[in-house]
Regions:
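Short, small-residue-enriched loops and turns at beta-alpha junctions
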Residues: 122, 162-164, 196-197
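Conserved active-site segment immediately N-terminal to the catalytic lysine
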Residues: 205-219
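Active-site nucleophile and cofactor-binding loops and adjacent substrate-binding regions
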Residues: 25-32, 52-59, 82-83, 194, ...
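Short acidic, glycine-rich surface-loop motifs adjacent to enzyme active sites
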Residues: 150-165
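Catalytic PLP-binding core of fold-type I/II PLP enzymes
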Residues: 167-201
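Single conserved hydrophobic/aromatic residue that forms the stacking wall/gate
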Residues: 1-5, 9, 218-225
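Glycine-rich phosphate-binding segment of PLP-dependent enzymes
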Residues: 3-28, 35-53
Length: 225
C-alpha cells in the first residue's frame, strides 16, 4: 500500500508512527483517540449529541452496538436480515445469514437473534411498483407476530448489503424501517463497515435515504448516539 501512496500519505503515516500509542484508552487515554472520535461525531448524520468508541474490528464494533442497545432498551431480541453479513464472532455469526464459509461447524450461536426478509428488488416476487410498501408491511407483520415490538432491542442492517451480493433496497424502505424503530423505542443500527466513508458517493450510504441511525458501525469503528 505504501509503495503506491503519494508522498503526502507517507509523511502522514510516518508522523503517526512517531506519535502512536497502542494502549487501552480506558487505562491510558491519548489525544489521537479523542481526535478521531470528535471527527466521527462531526461526520456522522444528525445534529444530536453523539458519542463514539473505537474497537479492534467490525465484528467487535457490532457486538458492542448490540450490547449497548440491549442495556439502553432493557430488551433482548435483535433483528437482522436475509443475505446479511456482520462478522465472524459468535454473536455476529448469528446475525450473519450465510452459512458457508462463515458459520459451518461453529455453533451453537448466540440466542435472541431473529431474521427477517430483505427488501431485495431483483429477487422480489411481488409487484415491483409497490415493493417499498409491501416489503415494509411484510417486515413489520413478521416482527409483530414472531417477536413482539416491545421485545426488540435493535434492528441491524447494512444499508447496502455487501457479502449478500451488493443489494440496494428500494428507495424509501430503509427510512420506513428506521422511523418504525423510533416509534417503537428500538435502536436502529446501520452497519456501514463496507458501505461507509464515501464508498457510495456520500459519506455514508444512509445519507442518500435521509436516514439518521441511532447507532453506526463503520470502517471497524462504531459511533453510538
Amino acid at each position: 500500500i505504501s509503495s503506491a501512496a503519494s508522498d503526502v500519505y507517507k509523511r502522514q503515516a510516518k508522523n503517526q508512527l512517531d506519535d502512536f500509542t497502542h494502549t487501552c484508552f480506558m487505562v491510558t487515554p491519548y489525544e489521537e483517540y479523542t481526535a478521531v472520535c470528535e471527527k466521527l461525531n462531526e461526520l456522522t448524520p444528525g445534529d444530536h449529541e453523539k458519542r463514539s468508541a473505537l474497537f479492534n474490528s467490525g465484528a467487535e464494533a457490532v457486538e458492542n452496538a448490540v450490547k449497548i442497545a440491549r442495556v439502553h432498551t432493557g430488551r433482548q431480541a435483535v433483528v437482522a436480515f436475509d443475505h446479511a453479513y456482520h462478522g465472524r464472532t459468535n454473536l455476529t455469526m448469528a446475525l450473519t445469514a450465510k452459512n458457508m464459509p462463515y458459520k459451518q461447524g461453529f455453533g451453537p450461536f448466540a440466542g435472541d437473534v431473529y431474521r427477517m426478509p430483505m427488501a431485495y428488488p431483483y429477487r422480489w416476487v411481488g409487484n415491483a411498483d409497490t415493493i417499498t410498501d409491501d416489503a415494509f408491511e411484510a417486515f413489520t407483520s413478521a416482527v409483530h407476530a414472531q417477536i413482539g415490538e416491545q421485545n426488540v432491542a435493535a434492528v441491524i442492517i447494512e444499508p447496502i448489503q455487501g457479502e449478500g451480493g451488493f443489494i440496494v433496497p428500494p428507495a424509501g424502505w430503509l427510512k420506513k424501517v428506521a422511523d418504525w424503530c423510533r416509534e417503537n423505542g428500538i435502536v436502529f443500527i446501520a452497519d456501514e463497515v463496507q458501505s461507509g466513508f464515501c464508498r457510495t458517493g456520500d459519506w455514508f450510504a444512509c445519507d442518500a435515504e435521509g436516514v439518521v441511525p441511532v447507532s453506526y458501525t463503520h470502517l471497524t469503528l462504531p459511533t453510538i448516539c
